Design a protein with these regions (language model features):
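Bacterial N-terminal signal peptides that target proteins for export
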Residues: 1-11
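Proline-aspartate-enriched helix->loop->beta-strand connector
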Residues: 106, 113-127, 143, 243-260
Length: 354
């Protein structure tokens, strides 16, 4: 009896000591290291010292995150449309593991499914800057939330820098920004040569509903920088539906087809789109209908490769002015410098739809 009591007392004392030791260690342990990053909405975001994974709500930013980090290993989740773009892009070649990134934490409308996000348990999440309700909810859940503004090339550059801070890749981020800035500086040197030249009328078209890139889109900047004029520059909004009659009145010299839908130049050349008459449009008659390229992401939207997109448009509009570079060489240089990857001829054909 005495031995049994002594053993029980000893076990109890050991348990109490263990609990007290645990409490003491909790009280004296140093707080987890944090970093503070300011997003493009001006919010201070507290991040863990090491960001092990991120979830990305806005469609284009997953490709930007890959470019900044040089890897997709930390991209735990992305938008379903970003995954659809991935399947047709160079990311599938450069980052096959990105195919495993989750998409069920975010809806097509960018609504965030908090339960699914919780399963991912990311170190941080990237959202659109206008998602104020979601940001408030994520803050309550203590999920570090980075809000990024989007719409212009400058927005992309600011976002690149923020993501560089998130990943601890500030120097690489600056190299990407300089890459963009150097190409844009090249276009500044071409303004004098474009003076007095006729500006081709360009229609930027998206899907069978005849949505066009209106004056509020980055596509207007792309076209104008390349020496053209967006026929829809006075149309309000972003991607705005118009009528076939309006397109006939514009009678564009060049048509660029978006990568957000499957329509191909042949669909216009062969008049395959029901209820639409393309055969009398100048761009169709003269064979100047082109499918926009897709590299890391669809070049239609602001992205890491936007300056290359402008170079592509420029050679379609003014090959005499912009004959001092080979876009294929520029592409090869970009992929070799940032991803240590040599583009094959097949890769180039895929990117440029040739």
């Amino acid at each position: 009896m005495t031995h049994r009591f002594s053993f029980g007392l000893l076990a109890g004392l050991l348990l109490i000591c263990a609990v007290l030791a645990g409490c003491g260690s909790q009280q004296t342990s140093a707080p987890k290291a944090e970093r503070v990053v300011t997003d493009t909405a001006g919010r201070e975001v507290h991040l863990p010292e090491e960001v092990k994974s991120i979830a990305v709500v806005p469609i284009p930013w997953a490709s930007v995150a890959f470019a900044v980090d040089g890897s997709a290993d930390r991209i735990a989740g992305m938008h379903p449309s970003a995954k659809a773009s991935y399947e047709k892009s160079m990311l599938k070649v450069l980052a096959p593991g990105m195919a495993n990134a989750a998409t069920d934490f975010v809806g097509q409308d960018f609504s965030i499914h908090m339960e699914e996000l919780g399963k991912l348990n990311p170190s941080a999440i990237i959202v659109w800057n206008y998602q104020e309700d979601e940001i408030a909810q994520l803050e309550k859940l203590k999920v570090p939330t980075i809000a990024l503004k989007y719409g212009t090339l400058e927005d992309v550059q600011q976002g690149i820098r923020v993501i560089g801070q998130v990943f601890g890749k500030e120097e690489r981020a600056e190299e990407l920004v300089r890459f963009q800035q150097d190409i844009m500086a090249y276009f500044e040197t071409k303004k004098a040569e474009l003076e007095g030249k006729a500006k081709p009328k360009v229609l930027y078209l998206r899907d069978r509903d005849l949505k066009v890139a209106a004056g509020g889109t980055v596509n207007t900047m792309m076209i104008e920088t390349a020496g053209g004029v967006n026929v829809a520059k006075d149309v309000q909004g972003q991607w705005t539906p118009v009528t076939m009659e309006q397109i006939a009145a514009w009678d564009p010299d060049v048509i660029i087809l978006s990568n957000f839908d499957p329509i191909q130049p042949a669909d216009l050349f062969e008049d395959k789109l029901e209820g639409q008459n393309w055969k009398n449009i100048k761009a169709v008659r003269e064979g100047r209908v082109y499918k926009a390229p897709i590299g890391l992401y669809r070049w239609d939207a602001p992205c890491v490769e936007t300056p290359l997109m402008i170079k592509w448009i420029a050679q379609k509009l003014h090959p005499d002015v912009f004959g001092d570079y080979r876009l294929t060489d520029d592409l090869r240089g970009f992929y070799e410098k940032f991803f240590s990857y040599t583009l094959t001829d097949a890769d180039l054909k895929m990117i440029l739809h040739e």
